[in-house]
Regions:
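Catalytic cores of the polymerase beta-like nucleotidyltransferase superfamily
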Residues: 1-307
Length: 307
């Protein structure tokens, strides 16, 4: 089924259909978009199932279907609203009845650049929160204070700043700081997933600087935060403390190799300097062994990047 045919069937039954998410953002960035995600509104789930009986339901907390469109299995979600009722990213009550509008769905999303939609079939841009303007200016901006309701959005904003070379709006950085407490209870798999993607960026240091600026480095990567302010002999390290040195090294590694494990090794190569007693600075005798001991105990709490 073509995209045009998919939209035509839905529109014939009073529904609206949109391309949403990263595909829209990347198209505006003039970067080749990848997988398309679709959203439908104005139709009940049962009616959708009747129209597309071969669609495979994969969503649990809210309905998401896999539909073959233009030869690819694409995700199709229903427009929905969310209300925070508990801790973390699972603490939401979701409603997705046909009355939910596209604007309401886009409002629940994290940043303006991710809160745009293209309505089919004409691909008319729906941009109630000025995401296109922020993409043009290279700014990551939260749609609303609801940004804080999923704490890992703070890491995602930092990671996307590194990926796209964007800056983070001041208010959004404050929202990131407001995620500090809940971040401590998040599954480490989610945090490491953002780390892995950040290490794939051209300049991974942007990710860590954004976390530091927002005051959440110490709760997401506490061992790294100990490097801040650790002095080094200026004749060997004119760049400054062990933290500045680490960020320079990880960016240098990124310029030499795309291998995530090698970039991770660069990130933690001086980890033991964070444990150096103040009286010993600016020297860090034995920091190599201390770093190995930290990694052995740390193990990134789940798994180290390997590729």
């Amino acid at each position: 089924m073509t995209e045009e045919a998919f939209a035509k069937v839905l529109r014939a039954h009073g529904a609206r259909v949109f391309i949403v998410g990263g595909w829209v953002r990347d198209a505006l960035r003039h970067v080749r978009p990848h997988d398309k995600d679709y959203m439908v509104s104005g139709i009940a789930e049962a009616d959708f199932q009747q129209l597309f009986p071969d669609a495979q339901k994969v969503g649990h907390g809210f309905p998401v279907y896999l539909v073959s469109i233009d030869g690819c299995l694409s995700e199709v979600a229903f427009a929905r609203k969310e209300r925070k009722e508990g801790q973390g990213y699972r603490g939401f009550r979701v409603s997705y009845d046909p009355s939910v509008t596209v604007e309401e769905d886009l409002y629940r999303r994290d940043t303006t650049m991710n809160s745009m939609a293209l309505e089919l079939p004409a691909k008319t841009l729906i941009d109630p929160y000025h995401g296109a303007r922020d993409v043009e200016k290279g700014i990551i901006r939260a749609v609303s204070p609801h940004f804080t309701e999923d704490p890992v959005r703070a890491l995602r904003a930092a990671r996307q700043a590194a990926e796209f070379g964007f800056s983070i709006a001041e208010q959004t950085s404050r929202y990131m700081h407001a995620c500090r407490e809940e971040l401590q209870g998040e599954p480490q798999e989610r945090i490491v997933a953002e780390l892995r993607r950040a290490l794939q960026a051209e300049r991974p240091s942007v990710f860590f600087r954004a976390l530091e600026r927002a005051g959440i480095l110490s709760v997401t990567f506490p061992e790294l935060s100990l490097l801040i302010g650790k002095t080094q002999p200026p004749e060997y390290h004119p760049e400054g403390d062990a933290w500045q040195h680490t960020l320079l090294v990880v960016d240098r590694a990124a310029s030499k190799t795309a291998n995530v494990a090698a970039r991770f090794a660069a990130l933690v190569h001086d980890l033991g300097k964070g444990m150096t007693p103040k009286a010993m600075e600016p020297h860090h005798y034995g920091h190599e062994q201390r770093g190995l001991e930290q990694l052995a105990a740390w193990d990134w709490r789940v798994t180290l990047p390997k590729d």
